[in-house]
Amino acid sequence: MRKFTQFVLITAAIMAAPSAFAEMKIAVLNYQMALLESDAAKQYAVDAEKKFGPQLNKLKNLERDAKALQDKLVSNGSKMSQGDREKAELDFKQKARDFQFQSKELNESKAAADRDMLKKLKPKLDQAVEETIKKGGYDMVIERGAVVDVKPQYDITRQVIERMNQLR
């Protein structure tokens, strides 16, 4: 709804003063893409995979083990002794609890790392956007999500990514 409202307001403004907007230099920017396609964000993704990969593999193994126990209970539960069945059920419940706990822990750690990365990269992205706007002499820059279609020559996302990659 917000994007539609932005679109309507921009369209109304453009139609209300065609001569003023005819001389304006307008560009479109996909802010999220500019952030995620930067070299720093790509490097973060590689580093995060190395950092969180072992935990993710541990979770997958835990899930596999729990699934195997569940399958064993379903297929052989009626043939098992009462003690064996109770032990298998208890093991399954413990693995399920461990999975939930470790999954939550991993998600929280990853979210914290993502926030830290965003905190570090946002100033660089903002600087790259400002420098690209100044260099291009743009009067108005619109978020890509607020427009239905745009010609490639009006999209400055690539320029912002390149500028951000130059910043150290």
From Swiss-Prot:
It comes from the Bacteria. GO terms for biological process: chaperone-mediated protein folding; protein stabilization. Disulfide bonds: none annotated. Keywords: Signal. It holds the Pfam family OmpH. The keyword Signal applies. This is Skp-like protein. The lineage of its organism: Bacteria, Pseudomonadati, Pseudomonadota, Gammaproteobacteria, Pseudomonadales.
